[in-house]
């Protein structure tokens, strides 16, 4: 039995002639040398981000073929216009019913060791395939996934560009997704700009809000750690 859903539309990815320079992305110096951030950062740094690898990861992330019925991709719930989260209280999986939890945003994952809202998983390597295989989310058999991708016309070449040969397995799927996810970065927020200049650019109201946020009796930052 073919792993492809019979009659399903297969849309070739629309990729630029030159891949995006994912490998040249870096975090600000202040981030990389902040003692507090180092308590969270660096998890997964052993995985090199390459232009071809992250490009493959992006294609995988947005491809509905990774779901059992070819209707849901990772990007269906993790929408770029909402910081790779979702505006709905509960996203829709392949069942068509709202899931129990809101989709979390995806950015600066170098600084997130524990994942999912209940923090039950440590590291992207242990997380990225779970939504794909979850029966209510994407519902895909992980055992069947490599064969399904091999049968699609565009994946062998993309895997060869990323890894030197067209072999497809779960380890490479995981690696490519991690490369793309770790390339999603937000480093130019109003707070980042303030951090770089000692918060000289903050208004009086913003400084008061920052003080309340980090105060020992409010402890907002204990959960909202960035």
What do these predicted ranges mean?
Residues 1-226:
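Periplasmic c-type cytochrome electron-transfer domains
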């Amino acid at each position: 039995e073919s792993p492809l859903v019979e009659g399903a539309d297969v849309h070739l990815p629309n990729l630029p002639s030159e891949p995006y320079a994912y490998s040249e992305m870096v975090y600000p110096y202040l981030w990389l040398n902040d003692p507090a951030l180092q308590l969270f950062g660096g998890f997964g740094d052993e995985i090199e981000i390459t232009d071809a690898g992250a490009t493959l990861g992006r294609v995988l992330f947005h491809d509905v073929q990774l779901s059992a019925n070819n209707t849901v991709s990772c990007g269906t719930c993790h929408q770029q216009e909402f910081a790779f989260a979702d505006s709905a209280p509960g996203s829709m999986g392949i069942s068509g019913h709202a899931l129990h939890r809101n989709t979390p945003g995806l950015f600066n994952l170098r600084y997130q060791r524990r994942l999912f809202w209940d923090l039950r998983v440590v590291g992207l390597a242990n997380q990225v395939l779970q939504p794909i295989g979850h029966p209510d989310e994407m519902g895909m058999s992980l055992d069947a996934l490599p064969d399904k991708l091999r049968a699609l016309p565009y994946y062998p070449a993309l895997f060869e560009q990323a890894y030197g040969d067209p072999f497809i397995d779960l380890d490479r799927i995981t690696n490519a997704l991690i490369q793309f996810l770790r390339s999603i970065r937000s480093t130019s927020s109003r707070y980042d700009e303030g951090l770089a200049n000692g918060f000289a650019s903050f208004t009086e109201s913003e400084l008061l809000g920052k003080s309340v946020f980090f105060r020992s009796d409010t402890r907002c930052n204990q959960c909202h750690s960035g």
